[in-house]
Swiss-Prot record, chain A:
Reaction(s) catalysed by this chain's protein: (R)-lactate + 2 Fe(III)-[cytochrome c] = 2 Fe(II)-[cytochrome c] + pyruvate + 2 H(+); (R)-2-hydroxyglutarate + pyruvate = (R)-lactate + 2-oxoglutarate
GO molecular function annotation: (R)-2-hydroxyglutarate dehydrogenase activity; actin binding; D-lactate dehydrogenase (cytochrome) activity; FAD binding
Gene Ontology terms: cellular component: mitochondrial matrix; mitochondrion
Organism name: Saccharomyces cerevisiae (strain ATCC 204508 / S288c)
InterPro entries: FAD-bd_oxidored_4_C, FAD-bd_PCMH, FAD-bd_PCMH-like_sf, FAD-bd_PCMH_sub1, FAD-bd_PCMH_sub2, FAD-linked_Oxase-like_C, FAD-oxidored/transferase_4, Oxid_FAD_bind_N
Class of enzymatic activity (EC top level): oxidoreductase
Protein known as: D-2-hydroxyglutarate--pyruvate transhydrogenase DLD2
Curated annotation (Swiss-Prot), chain B:
EC numbers on record: 1.1.99.40, 1.1.2.4
Protein name, UniProt field: D-2-hydroxyglutarate--pyruvate transhydrogenase DLD3
SUPFAM superfamilies: FAD-binding/transporter-associated domain-like, FAD-linked oxidases, C-terminal domain
Keyword list, A-Z: Cytoplasm, FAD, Flavoprotein, Isopeptide bond, Oxidoreductase, Ubl conjugation
InterPro entries: FAD-bd_oxidored_4_C, FAD-bd_PCMH, FAD-bd_PCMH-like_sf, FAD-bd_PCMH_sub1, FAD-bd_PCMH_sub2, FAD-linked_Oxase-like_C, FAD-oxidored/transferase_4, Oxid_FAD_bind_N
Main localization, broad class: cytoplasm
One Gene Ontology cellular component annotation held by this UniProt entry: cytoplasm
Known catalytic reactions: (R)-lactate + 2 Fe(III)-[cytochrome c] = 2 Fe(II)-[cytochrome c] + pyruvate + 2 H(+); (R)-2-hydroxyglutarate + pyruvate = (R)-lactate + 2-oxoglutarate
Role description: Catalyzes the reversible oxidation of (R)-2-hydroxyglutarate to 2-oxoglutarate coupled to reduction of pyruvate to (R)-lactate. Can also use oxaloacetate as electron acceptor instead of pyruvate producing (R)-malate.
Cofactor: FAD
Length: 530, 496
C-alpha cells in the first residue's frame, strides 16, 4: 500500500528539550515496572544457583573490618544491614533476577577513600562488588553471596568541561542524565543515550561498554572515552584522565577497562568527548514486507541520509502487537499491520536541509516499493509518540508475566533468522500460543546499524521447560553465525558461562591471564565475567 | 627530535649506547634451512651485503639503518605463525614491517633483527556493502584499500599522505591518525576485529567480530598502536563509511589563535555533521610553502598570522554549499576572520588542500628539519610553537643565511588537539638540538600534553614516555610486553 507522506505543517519546530519529555515518560514506565515487579519476591542467587559456591578464600566480615572502615569513612558513607534495612536496593539487580546477601555498603566520597578500601580488602581478601546505578541487565553489579558493595554514588562531581573541544571530565558516579544535562547547557550532547539514563552512572556505562541508541552516529565508547581514572584491586590509583583526543604513547590501557565490568579495576573518573548538540531532529516510522527490505532501506538510508542518520531501528510485527496492548490510548501510526517496521531518526544542524533529505529519501524508497507505508513526525509530540512504539517493547514483552531477554550481535543478513529459528523451536515444543501455553511468542527488534538484535521471548510464566528449549540453543545458533552472545549488555553473572560461544579458547585464556594479573586474589567482582 | 638525513648512518654507530642484546641468537645456516623449508624462494631475501636490503633496513626519514641480512615475506598467516614460533624458540629477534612509512624508526631493525615483511599478504578478504564492514590482509596498501572501497561507494575511515606506500596492518599497528580523524574518529572505535600472530606463534583472531560485541576484555585494543611489540597484525576488519557525494573547502586568514578556536567552535555548531577537517597553519608554515610552491597563486590577497582550512563532506552538495556559504558570510560579516576563500570546483578544492599538504615538504626543502608531533589542550595548542620560536630567537639562531634555522613552523589538526612543530633548518647542529631537547618535551609535560599524538614511540621516542605517562602506567605497559613477549624477541630496543 502506497500512502502519501503527510503534509508537514508550517512552523513546526523541534527542540532538543523534547527528548527530555520523552525520557521522562520513559522513566515513568520504568517506575511502573518496578512497582509491578515488587509483587514478586526476588529469590537469593545462591539458592537459585546451588552449583555456584562461595569462594572459601574470601574472608567473612568481622568487627575489626568494620572498625577499619569506620576509621576512614564518615557515618553517611557506611550502610549496614539491620532489621529495618535489608539493603535490598543494593543487593537486587534491575531485573530482580539476582539477589545477593551483602551486609555492608560503602559509599566513599573520594578516590583516595576508594583506594584505601580496596587496599584493605585486597590485603584481607574481602570480596568487593563495585556498583554504580545498578541498571545492568546481566547481574554484573550485584553480589552473589556476601561481597562488600562499593557504591560510587557519592562520587558525583563534574570535574571539568572544555567548551572548545567538548571534553568532559567527571566522577564515575555522575548520573548519565545529569552529565548530559550539564553539557547540553553548553550546546553539547553526551555521545551515548540509554533508556536507563535517569539512573545509570557514567562510570558504570563505561565499565559495561554500554551501546545505546547513538552508537550508529557517534560510535563506541572505545573511540569516545579519552581517559580514565581507575583504582586497581590493590588500591593503586591509575590516572589517565587525559584531555587529549590523540595520544599515541604506548599501549592504550584504558581500553581494557572499557567493558571490563569492574573485574580488573574500579573506574572512578571519566574523560569523554561530547558532541555538538544537534539543532534539528526528525523521526519517520515505516513499514516493509521482509527483513531483506529492512536491509535495503538501511543501505539507502546510509547513502542518502548519511551524515544526518542517527538511529535506524527495526521492529517485527509481533513486537508492535505487544506494544499496542500497552499503548492503549495511542493511535498506531499506520493503518495496516505489516511484517516489519522501521524507525529512522535524523539529527543535524539545519532543519530545512534535513527535512529535504528525509523527504527525498522517503519518496525514493516508497516509489520503488521497498517501503509500503510511512509517516513523518510533524511536531515534537508526534516525534515522541513514534519513539514510544520502539521504546515500549521491553515493557510490553514483560507484561504477560515475564520475558527471557537475549541481546546478541549477528551479521546483518542473518540478524532476524534467530527470531524465526526460536519461534520454530518453541512451536515444535508446543510451548507457544494462546493461554494456557506458557509462551506468548518470540519477538525481535534492534539496532540495524550495529547488527544488534534484541530477542525477547514473552512468557506467561517462567519454567524449566522453556529455559531448556531456549538454552543453549540460542547461543549455539548465534555462534554458528559467528555472532556475539552479548552485543550490549555484557557478560555479568548471567552470561559468564557463554563467552565460549563468541570467543576462542585462546582469547578466553588471554582474558583470564589479564584478570589474574591485575586481581591475583580475585576479590574484585568475583563469580562473574570470565 | 627527528632529523632528516640524505643517507642513514648505521643506527648501531649513531647510538653507541644501545647494545645488541646478547640473549638473541645470531642467525646461522640451520635457521636459513628451516625458513627455506616452510617458505618458497620468492618469500626469502637473504644477502650478506646489507646494502642490497637497504629499503628494508632504512626508515622512511633515512635516519635509522639496521643491518638485517634476512627478509622474510610470507604469503599466509600460517607461515607467519611458524616463523614466530621458530624465532621464539630459538630466541631470534624479529621486526615486523609493513610499508615502512613510519616516522619514529618503529619498523626497521636496530641491529641484525630478521625483518618479517607483510607485503605478500595483500588480499582483500571480504566486504559487506550493507554494514560497510571491510576485511583485508595486513599487507594491503592503503591506496588499494581506498580504491577498492571507492569502487563500492565507501570510504576508508582514515587517510594519510603516505597512502601510496603504507599498509593497513601498519596503520593499525601504529594507530595512525591522519586527516579524517575529526570526522570518523580513531582506529580504537573503527577497527572491529584483528587477526594477530603472537610472539609464540599463536594466532588470535576476532576478525569476524561485529560492530557490537561486549563479551570480555577488548583485547584487540592493545594491538592497536602497539607498534608490533606484542603481536604481528596479519588481518584487519574495519568499518567503512558511506562515501561522501559532496566535498567542499574554504581557506581563511585569521589574526590570532584564540580566534582559530572560536572559529572551530562555530564550525562544529554550524557545519556540525558535514565538518570533516579543520586544519590550522601559522604564518611561518605558509611562508615556507609560498616559497616552495612558487608558481601556485596564493588563495588569499594578504598575509595573516594564522590560516585555517576547513573541509566539509556530505551527501548533498547544494545543502553543503548553502551551509558553508552561510558560514563564510557570517564569519566575514562578524569580522571573526580577516579573509576567506571558498573552493568553486574540484580543482580549487585540490589547490586549497595543496597549501596544507605541502607544508612538511616545504619545511624540509631548505636542507632539513626537526619534526615534533604532539597533543595539547586546545587552549595551549599553539603555545609550544611560540615558546620554541622565542627560544630559538633568543639564541640568535633564526633568520637569513648563515643562521642555521630558517623558520619555526606550527600547524596541525585542531579537532584532534594535534600540533606538528617543524623547525626548518639549513643544517643540523648540536646547538639547535640542545636548545630543542629536552625543552620541547618538558614543555609538553608541563601542559599535560602528549609527546606523540600520531607518530608513536618507535626507537626515536623510547625513553621519553615519562613525559606523558605516569610511572604506574609505564609499569603496566612493561608488564604487558613481558607477558606476551617473555623472550623480548618482537621488535626489541623500542617502544617501552
Amino acid at each position: 500500500m502506497l500512502r502519501n507522506i503527510l503534509v508537514r505543517s508550517t512552523g513546526s519546530n523541534f527542540k532538543f528539550a523534547g527528548r527530555y519529555m520523552k525520557s521522562s515518560a520513559l522513566l515513568g514506565y520504568y517506575r511502573r515496572v518496578n512497582y509491578y515487579s515488587t509483587k514478586i519476591q526476588t529469590r537469593l542467587t545462591s539458592e537459585n544457583y546451588p552449583d555456584v559456591h562461595r569462594d572459601p578464600r574470601f574472608k567473612k566480615l568481622t568487627s575489626d573490618d568494620l572498625n577499619y572502615f569506620k576509621s576512614i569513612l564518615s557515618e553517611q558513607e557506611i550502610l549496614r544491614a539491620s532489621e529495618s534495612e535489608d539493603l535490598s536496593f543494593y543487593n537486587e539487580d534491575w531485573m530482580r533476577k539476582y539477589k545477593g546477601q551483602s551486609k555492608l555498603v560503602l559509599r566513599p566520597k573520594s578516590v583516595e577513600k576508594v583506594s584505601l578500601i580496596l587496599n584493605y580488602c585486597n590485603d584481607e581478601k574481602i570480596a568487593v562488588v563495585p556498583q554504580g546505578g545498578n541498571t545492568g541487565l546481566v547481574g554484573g553489579s550485584v553480589p552473589i553471596f556476601d561481597e562488600l558493595i562499593l557504591s560510587l554514588a557519592n562520587l558525583n562531581k563534574i570535574r571539568d568541561f572544555d567548551p572548545v573541544s567538548g571534553i568532559l571530565k567527571c566522577d564515575a558516579g555522575v548520573i548519565l542524565e545529569n552529565a548530559n544535562n550539564y553539557v547540553m547547557e553548553q550546546n553539547y550532547m553526551f555521545p551515548l543515550d540509554l533508556g536507563a539514563k535517569g539512573s545509570c552512572h557514567v562510570g558504570g556505562v563505561v565499565a559495561t561498554n554500554a551501546g545505546g541508541l547513538r552508537l550508529l552516529r557517534y560510535g563506541s565508547l572505545h573511540g569516545s572515552v579519552l581517559g580514565l581514572e581507575v583504582v586497581m584491586p590493590n588500591g593503586q590509583i591509575v590516572n589517565s584522565m587525559h584531555s587529549m583526543r590523540k595520544d599515541n604513547t604506548g599501549y592504550d590501557l584504558k581500553q581494557l577497562f572499557i567493558g571490563s565490568e569492574g573485574t580488573i579495576g574500579i573506574i572512578t573518573g571519566v574523560s569523554i568527548l561530547t558532541v555538538p548538540k544537534p539543532k534539528a531532529f526528525n523521526v519517520s516510522y515505516l513499514s516493509v514486507e521482509s527483513f531483506e527490505d529492512v536491509q535495503k532501506v538501511f543501505v539507502r538510508a546510509r547513502q542518502e541520509l548519511s551524515e544526518i542518520l542517527s538511529a535506524f531501528e527495526f521492529m517485527d510485527a509481533k513486537s508492535q502487537v505487544l506494544a499496542k496492548s500497552q499503548l492503549k490510548d495511542a493511535a498506531f501510526p499506520l493503518e495496516d499491520e505489516h511484517p516489519f517496521y522501521i524507525l529512522i531518526e535524523t539529527s543535524g544542524s539545519n532543519k530545512d536541509h534535513d527535512d529535504s533529505k528525509l523527504e527525498t529519501f522517503l519518496e525514493n524508497v516508497m516509489e520503488e516499493g521497498i517501503v509500503t507505508d510511512g509517516v513523518v513526525a510533524q511536531d515534537e509530540t508526534e516525534l515522541q509518540n513514534l519513539w514510544k512504539w520502539r521504546e515500549m517493547i521491553p515493557e510490553a514483552s514483560q507484561a504477560n508475566g515475564g520475558v527471557y531477554k537475549y541481546d546478541v550481535s549477528l551479521p546483518l543478513k542473518d540478524l532476524y533468522s534467530l527470531v524465526e529459528a526460536t519461534n520454530a523451536r518453541l512451536s515444535e515444543a508446543e510451548l507457544v500460543g494462546d493461554s494456557p501455553k506458557p509462551v506468548v511468542g518470540a519477538i525481535g527488534y534492534g539496532h540495524v546499524g550495529d547488527g544488534n538484535l534484541h530477542l525477547n521471548v514473552a512468557v506467561r510464566e517462567y519454567n524449566k521447560n522453556i529455559e531448556k528449549t531456549l538454552e543453549p540453543f540460542v547461543y549455539e545458533f548465534v555462534s554458528s553465525k559467528h555472532g556475539s552472545v552479548s552485543a550490549e549488555h555484557g557478560l555479568g553473572f548471567q552470561k559468564k558461562n557463554y563467552i565460549g560461544y563468541s570467543k576462542s579458547p585462546e582469547e578466553v585464556k588471554m582474558m583470564k591471564d589479564l584478570k589474574v594479573h591485575y586481581d591475583p586474589n580475585g576479590i574484585l567482582n568475583p563469580y562473574k565475567y570470565i | 627530535m627527528t632529523a632528516a638525513h640524505p643517507v642513514a648512518q648505521l643506527t648501531a654507530e649513531a647510538y653507541p649506547k644501545v647494545k645488541r642484546n646478547p640473549n638473541f641468537k645470531v642467525l646461522d645456516s640451520e635457521d636459513l634451512a628451516y625458513f627455506r623449508s616452510i617458505l618458497s624462494n620468492d618469500e626469502i631475501l637473504n644477502s650478506q651485503a646489507p646494502e642490497e636490503l637497504a629499503s628494508f633496513n632504512q626508515d622512511w626519514m633515512k635516519k635509522y639503518r639496521g643491518q638485517s641480512n634476512l627478509i622474510l615475506l610470507p604469503n599466509s598467516t600460517d607461515k607467519v605463525s611458524k616463523i614466530m614460533k621458530y624465532c621464539n624458540d630459538k630466541k631470534l629477534a624479529v621486526v615486523p614491517q609493513g610499508g615502512n612509512t613510519d616516522l619514529v624508526g618503529a619498523s626497521v631493525p636496530v641491529f641484525d633483527e630478521i625483518v618479517l615483511s607483510l607485503r605478500n599478504m595483500n588480499k582483500v578478504r571480504d566486504f559487506d556493502p550493507v554494514s560497510g564492514t571491510f576485511k583485508c590482509d595486513a599487507g594491503v596498501v592503503m591506496r588499494d584499500a581506498h580504491q577498492f572501497l571507492h569502487d563500492h561507494d565507501h570510504i576508508f575511515p582514515l587517510d594519510l599522505p603516505s597512502r601510496n606506500n603504507c599498509q593497513v596492518g601498519g596503520v593499525v599497528s601504529t594507530n595512525a591518525g591522519g586527516l579524517n580523524f575529526l570526522r570518523y574518529g580513531s582506529l580504537h572505535g573503527n577497527v572491529l576485529g584483528l587477526e594477530v600472530v603472537l610472539p609464540n606463534g599463536e594466532i588470535i583472531s576476532n576478525i569476524n567480530a561485529l560492530r557490537k560485541d561486549n563479551t570480555g576484555y577488548d583485547l584487540k585494543q592493545l594491538f592497536i598502536g602497539a607498534e608490533g611489540t606484542i603481536g604481528v597484525v596479519t588481518g584487519v576488519s574495519i568499518v567503512a563509511a558511506a562515501k561522501p557525494k559532496a566535498l567542499n573547502a574554504v581557506f581563511f586568514g585569521i589574526e590570532n589563535f584564540d580566534t582559530v578556536q572560536k572559529l572551530f567552535v562555530k564550525a562544529k555548531s554550524e557545519l556540525s555533521e558535514i565538518l570533516s577537517a579543520f586544519e590550522f597553519m601559522d604564518r611561518g608554515s605558509i611562508e615556507c610553502t609560498i616559497e616552495y610552491l612558487k608558481d601556485l597563486p596564493f588563495p588569499l590577497e594578504n598575509q595573516h598570522n594564522f590560516y585555517v582550512l576547513i573541509e566539509t563532506s556530505g551527501s548533498n552538495k547544494r545543502h553543503d554549499d548553502e551551509k558553508l556559504t552561510a558560514f563564510l558570510k557570517d564569519t566575514t560579516d562578524s569580522k571573526l576572520i580577516s579573509e576567506g576563500m571558498m573552493a568553486k570546483d574540484k580543482a580549487d578544492f585540490d589547490r586549497l588542500w595543496t597549501w596544507r599538504k605541502s607544508v612538511p615538504t616545504a619545511c624540509n626543502s631548505y636542507g632539513g628539519m626537526y619534526k615534533y608531533d604532539m597533543s595539547l589542550q586546545l587552549k595551549d595548542l599553539y603555545s609550544v610553537s611560540a615558546a620554541v620560536t622565542e627560544r630559538l630567537n633568543a639564541a640568535g639562531l633564526i633568520g637569513d643565511a648563515p643562521k642555521p634555522v630558517v623558520k619555526s613552523c606550527g600547524y596541525g589538526h585542531v579537532g584532534d588537539g594535534n600540533i606538528h612543530l617543524n623547525i626548518a633548518v639549513r643544517e643540523f647542529t648540536k646547538q639547535i638540538e640542545d636548545l630543542l631537547e629536552p625543552f620541547v618535551y618538558e614543555y609538553i609535560a608541563s601542559k599535560k600534553g602528549s609527546i606523540s599524538a600520531e607518530h608513536g614511540i618507535g626507537f626515536h621516542k623510547k625513553g621519553k614516555l615519562h613525559y606523558t605517562r605516569s610511572d604506574i602506567e609505564i609499569r603496566f605497559m612493561k608488564d604487558i610486553k613481558n607477558h606476551y613477549d617473555p623472550n623480548g624477541i618482537l621488535n626489541p630496543y623500542k617502544y617501552i
